[in-house]
Design a protein with these regions (language model features):
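N-terminal, charge-rich interaction modules
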Residues: 1-92
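Duplex nucleic acid-engaging cores and interfaces of nucleic-acid transaction enzymes
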Residues: 95-98
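Compact, Lys/Arg-rich rRNA/RNP-binding cores from ribosome-related proteins
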Residues: 100, 114
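Short cationic amphipathic helices and targeting signals
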Residues: 102-108
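Helix N-cap motif at beta-to-alpha junctions
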Residues: 109-113
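Helix-rich interaction surfaces within compact, conserved domain-sized segments
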Residues: 116, 120-166
Length: 166
């Protein structure tokens, strides 16, 4: 079912006026301008975004934490190594350091618009990007990279890395 420009515009307005349901609750400063440029185009609206982040979390924690883990540290900005080290308590259990790269989810008016933006994403190095066609003509583009990193820091309370900073 093909959507009219008026229907897309209405849905875009609803999306932009909706509550930000992300854990952080707002768009990351590092990509505010990019999100603004995308949303200023009639054919696109961002539905979620993250500029990238580092996370230190503990696995195997009692229920009640997201996906069975407790977040001990998170930042969407550059981090001083000492700041991260200070948040490490190996007694917590199984600690994991994780880097997640930028991700954007963009609703597109047509498949042709999505293909154009998808080509731009691929040429910019976001090789894990893709287009999803949903029910009722909904076209979504995910701009993603495969440059993530996940490193165990401690296991069963035993530190697996050194506290030394070079």
């Amino acid at each position: 079912m093909k959507m009219t420009p008026e229907e897309f515009r209405h849905q875009k307005c609803q999306t932009l006026q909706g509550v930000d349901l992300s854990r952080k609750g707002c768009i990351d400063d590092a990509i505010k301008l990019l999100v603004e440029v995308i949303n200023n185009r009639d054919e696109f609206v961002t539905t979620s975004s993250c500029s990238g982040r580092v996370i230190l979390f503990c696995e195997n924690i009692a229920e009640g934490h997201k996906k069975g883990c407790k977040w001990l540290f998170t930042s969407h900005d550059s981090v001083e190594i000492q700041e991260l080290i200070n948040s490490v308590d190996p007694a917590e259990g199984n600690l994991v350091f994780k880097y997640e790269p930028l991700i954007l989810h963009i609703r597109c008016f047509t498949l042709d618009h999505a293909k154009l933006l998808h080509t731009c994403a691929l040429e910019a190095g976001f090789r894990n990007s893709g287009i999803t066609l949903g029910k009722h003509g909904k076209v979504m583009l995910a701009v993603r990279s495969c440059m993530g990193l996940e490193v165990p820091i401690s296991e069963n309370g035993e530190l697996l890395v050194s506290h030394k900073v070079k």
